[in-house]
């Protein structure tokens, strides 16, 4: 990618970023006391549409963030190393369906639970990522802002998915418990190269999982509208 292309992308990103920050419809659905309500004013179908919209935006911004980090901090020979065993994704151990046959066999509710597990597994690592990126001498504000935006929207997405599961199951109360698995391990003071590769792995893996969230939610939408023609 030549320097002019990079600059052009930077200009467009700067122009569109304020719009992206305000374009998404908020998922927050709270009572005055701050607890999640059953959202009686919005249908399950519309809530799912909002959840999908959030997932689409999160994936898009995660893709932009990963590409920006890669261009700025990761030499080309090191870009393949994130696939090695030492840089495995933190969600690898989660019971998330991966093959097409597995996905086709699970229920709608388990699709949503899979999304919830992925969302909650990334909340803490993204907070950590904000802290570590802030220590880079030449990290652009655009990258820091995107990471903060995704972190905030992920919490909003979590709230929307929890409410959606409650609506589908008609449950009065549902709380999140997957975060207790402790999937993310901190290294006190990694050297600079190790820190770059770890952050690159986090961004790359999150982009991949954000895409899974979007795919699962869109599959759920398809099942509800055209059950027998969803791949």
Swiss-Prot record:
InterPro entries, sorted: 4_helix_cytokine-like_core, Somatotropin/Prolactin, Somatotropin_CS
Cellular component GO terms held in the UniProt record: extracellular space
Primary location group: secreted
Tissue: Pituitary gland.
Keyword annotations: Disulfide bond, Glycoprotein, Hormone, Secreted, Signal
Disulphide bonds in the chain: 29-39, 89-205, 222-230
Record bears the keyword rRNA-binding: no
Domain of life: Eukaryota
Keyword set includes ATP-binding: no
Glycosylation sites: 145
Record-level Gene Ontology MF annotations: growth hormone activity; growth hormone receptor binding
Subcellular location: Secreted
GO biological process: animal organ development; growth hormone receptor signaling pathway; positive regulation of growth; positive regulation of receptor signaling pathway via JAK-STAT; response to nutrient levels
Signal peptide (from-to): 1-24
Protein family membership: Belongs to the somatotropin/prolactin family.
UniProt protein name: Somatolactin
Native source species: Paralichthys olivaceus (Bastard halibut)
